[in-house]
Amino acid sequence: MHWHNNIRTRSRMWIAILAVVVTATGLLVKRSLASDHQDTADVELNPSMDMTDVYAFPGSAAGRIALVLDSWALLTPAEAAPGVTSFDDNLLYQFKVDNTGDAQEDKVIQVTFHGSGADQTIEVRGPMAPPVVGAMRNTVADVAPTLSGKVATVLGSASGMQVFAGPRQDPFYIDLEQFFRIIPDRKPVTGPLSMLPDTPSASSFRAPGAAVDILGGSGGHPFNVLSIVIELPASQLRGSTDKIGVWGTISR
């Protein structure tokens, strides 16, 4: 059993019940109502722990589910180039699944990385019972990896688990430039958005049709994240019912 010292955890809990059955998987999934990018000074100074979003949605075929954990907000295209920005090999990334309705993880998928740059590799363990339950835990299960290989490569099979880890365009939509004009004390300390005024210069978001998807590049500033994407049979996560809760943690 392996340990990392100086435990620090970022968690994103999916807190509201999705009102639509995910028919492709037969699951009801709990979902988040919020997204956070550089939401504290601590994660802005430690961007590898900045978990921006967690997603769960039907997979590429019936009976499959896709899970996504995005981190390291506001990467520029240059920073997201192959081998430039790496996952932190001192961190434990986890998808946690509650399939009994008690808001505690019943299954986890653990992801760790080794090395950096273009030669970085990934190991995925699970889904399995958690070695330890709770947010402030970074114990890596003492089991063989389910999948392993190089980052920025699709690993696994379409009938079992498939994994991709690497830079991708941030899928979250927000008129971030206007947000920082409304609340300038939340703007980043580096990068193009740091050049916005230090005092409020707007009082509301732009009208529909005029809003700019800054993260998607509509304003000339395309941003990326480091994504961990896992697709697998939904039966591997399901409990006695078809309702699951999914959240993510990043622990040091």
Language-model features, listed with the residues they occupy:
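N-terminal secretory signal peptides that target proteins for export/translocation
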Residues: 1-10
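Bacterial N-terminal signal peptides
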Residues: 15-26
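Hydrophobic alpha-helical segments, especially transmembrane helices
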Residues: 9-13, 31
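Structured catalytic/translocation cores of nucleotide/phosphate-coupled proteins
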Residues: 3, 26-28
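Surface-exposed extracytoplasmic segments
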Residues: 29-252
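A detector of low-complexity, intrinsically disordered, Ser/Thr/Gly/Pro/Ala-rich segments
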Residues: 7, 21-23, 38
